Regions:
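Glycine-rich phosphate/pyrophosphate-binding beta-alpha loops
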Residues: 31, 87-101, 164
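ATP/nucleoside-binding phosphotransfer catalytic cores, i.e., glycine-rich phosphate-binding loops
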Residues: 73-75, 80, 105, 115-177
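Short linear motifs in intrinsically disordered
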Residues: 2-11, 55-64, 103, 139-151, ...
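Gly/Ser/Thr-rich active-site loops/lids in small-molecule metabolic enzymes
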Residues: 43-52, 102-122
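A generic structural signal for short beta-strands and their flanking turns/coil linkers
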Residues: 65-67, 82-84, 107-111, 146-148
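Catalytic core of DAGKc-family lipid kinases
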Residues: 1-84
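Short acidic/glycine-rich loop or secondary-structure boundary segments that cap or lie
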Residues: 31-34, 79-81, 93-97, 121-124
Length: 177
């Protein structure tokens, strides 16, 4: 920590979502539901932070309701349907240290899109395992892209850098310098 205070400051990109600036991750599917509700559950002593999120995931899965999500880029719909994971990343990690933005870089000028479409309940543990192993990209239902701007339309609450925001339409664009 002390050494970091003497390092030269580096410029980073931001994601601008309407009038909200995002340094790390904007998410809006089951991943957002967990992030928005993790603090409503009692922490289990001696359980690492990442596993606290897994604990909440297991408790919330039966209560989760899917919401249609539409993602548009350059006037073309790139996704329309239900999602389990919907993360627009500038940084690589979210909630408890999970690596969601595998190719995200705060200085590359792109938003790193990471989606997992609705999956059968029998595959949930497999995808949790992939996420814990930082290999979500190995899942057949995983979608990835890198874009400079994208529009999101969702009826689910959105989580931006740990804060909860209302459902709706969000125009996301990368802001540099």
């Amino acid at each position: 920590l002390r050494k970091s205070l003497s390092l030269k400051a580096q410029p980073i990109d931001l994601i601008k979502a309407n009038d909200i600036y995002c340094i790390n991750v904007l998410c809006c599917a089951f991943d957002s539901d967990i992030a928005n509700n993790v603090h409503n559950y009692r922490k289990i002593k001696f359980l690492p932070k990442a596993l606290q999120y897994v604990n909440v995931l297991i408790k919330r899965i039966s209560k989760y309701r899917f919401y249609p999500t539409k993602v548009i880029s350059n006037n073309k719909v790139i996704y329309n349907g239900d999602l389990v994971v919907c993360a627009f990343c500038n940084g690589r990690y979210f909630g408890g240290g999970f690596e969601i933005g595998k190719d995200a870089n705060v200085q590359d000028g792109f938003i790193d899109l990471n989606f997992v479409s609705t999956l059968p309940k029998r595959l949930i543990l497999y995808y949790i395992f992939l996420m814990l192993k930082k290999r979500l990209d190995l899942g057949k239902l995983y979608f990835h892209d890198k874009l400079k701007s994208v529009d999101l339309i969702t009826r689910q609450e959105v989580n931006i850098d740990g804060e909860t925001y209302q459902p709706g339409r969000y125009h996301l664009e990368i802001v540099s310098d």
